[in-house]
């Protein structure tokens, strides 16, 4: 793949993939889809919110589409199983996740999910809980939900931008600081009986060093890039569909539920861009049986230019430069009434080299 660098798999990543293949040989499914919510509220910022009515409608659609809601760790194991043959299952599976532990998860989402008997995962930045911030959950609420199907997982201690270095910060100091972020959060979760090896990158940001750190600590990592999980997914950078603001429409939600992992080879591309602000994306497919003429990719400026460099390789080039902040390319390929789906993150600093501000 092309880009400013390639993210190489860690030893942990390879062991995790092997373990997933061994443990679940009788439960292979086509894909596992993970949903990502933040606020379930009408009075919070639209960019991270879904209304209670919209959330309930999403849950009803899950039922109507015949999906089984699984705990997140089980969904990962089953969807990354590469077995085939008579044991293969056609079961459609989905997992529900929330980032940041906002209070509306307890007051609005939890009663809905509890009534349905569905498991879910909350990724918690523990310092916000420790500080008793009124906008966030309490340890008592997290513990209560954990007894009713919730997995409480790691989202760092302070919800920091993991890829950002302090002024004049050396690599070893940065690594130590990030280890403390992860281990402090883990320690607090363990102290409350809420241990998990699941981790979500704050803001969905990552680079090679953060992925390696998460792998070295034996965690499974989740981003905020779209797509479904399959046998070739990177267990340190699993996709989730962010659902908020303008991205909660019912038709689009059904398409995301039905989506399949685009069968391309990993590793992922290093997302940070520093000189070429129109970074190309090379997709290397694991098979030459797909009709790649139906592949569509969107990026800055809309539809991306595609060129087949071989029977299994496609190069996608954006019409415009990626903007300052976080940008994603999204590629889809139809399969019947479903879509293969792949998303790639890009990160660009401001022109003076400083970091962008969050909205």
Q: What do these predicted regions represent?
A:
Residues 263-359:
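Beta-strand-enriched, solvent-exposed domains that form extended recognition/catalytic surfaces
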Residues 243-277:
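Short, compositionally biased P/S/T/A/G/V-rich stretches that sit at domain boundaries
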């Amino acid at each position: 793949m092309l880009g400013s660098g390639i993210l190489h798999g860690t030893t942990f990543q390879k062991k995790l993939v092997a373990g997933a293949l061994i443990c679940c040989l009788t439960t292979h499914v086509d894909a596992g889809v993970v949903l990502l919510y933040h606020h379930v509220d009408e009075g919070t910022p639209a960019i991270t919110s879904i209304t209670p009515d919209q959330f309930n409608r999403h849950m009803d659609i899950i039922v109507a589409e015949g999906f089984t809601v699984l705990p997140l760790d089980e969904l990962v194991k089953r969807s990354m199983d590469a077995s085939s043959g008579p044991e293969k299952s056609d079961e459609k599976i989905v997992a529900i996740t929330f980032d940041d532990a906002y209070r509306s998860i307890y007051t609005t989402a939890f009663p809905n999910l509890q009534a349905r008997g569905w498991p879910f995962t909350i990724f918690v930045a523990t310092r916000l809980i420790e500080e008793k911030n009124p906008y966030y959950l309490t340890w008592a609420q997290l513990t209560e939900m954990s007894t009713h199907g919730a997995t409480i997982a790691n989202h760092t201690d302070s919800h920091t931008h993991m890829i950002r270095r302090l002024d004049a910060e050396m690599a070893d100091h940065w690594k130590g600081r990030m280890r403390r972020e992860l281990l402090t959060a883990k320690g607090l979760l363990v102290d409350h009986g809420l241990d998990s090896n699941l981790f979500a990158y704050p803001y969905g940001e990552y680079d090679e060093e953060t992925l390696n750190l998460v792998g070295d600590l034996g965690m499974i990592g989740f981003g905020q890039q779209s797509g479904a999980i399959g046998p070739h997914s990177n267990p340190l950078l699993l996709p989730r569909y962010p659902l908020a603001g303008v991205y909660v429409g019912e038709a689009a939600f059904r398409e995301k539920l039905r989506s399949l992992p685009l069968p391309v080879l990993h590793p992922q591309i290093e997302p940070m861009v520093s000189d070429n602000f129109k970074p190309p994306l090379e997709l290397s497919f694991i098979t030459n049986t797909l009709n790649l003429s139906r592949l569509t990719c969107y990026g800055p400026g809309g539809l991306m230019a595609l060129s087949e460099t071989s029977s299994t390789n496609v190069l996608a080039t954006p019409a415009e430069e990626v903007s300052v902040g976080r940008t994603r390319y999204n590629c889809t390929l139809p399969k019947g009434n479903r879509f293969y789906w792949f998303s790639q993150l890009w990160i660009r600093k401001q022109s003076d080299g400083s970091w962008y501000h969050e909205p």
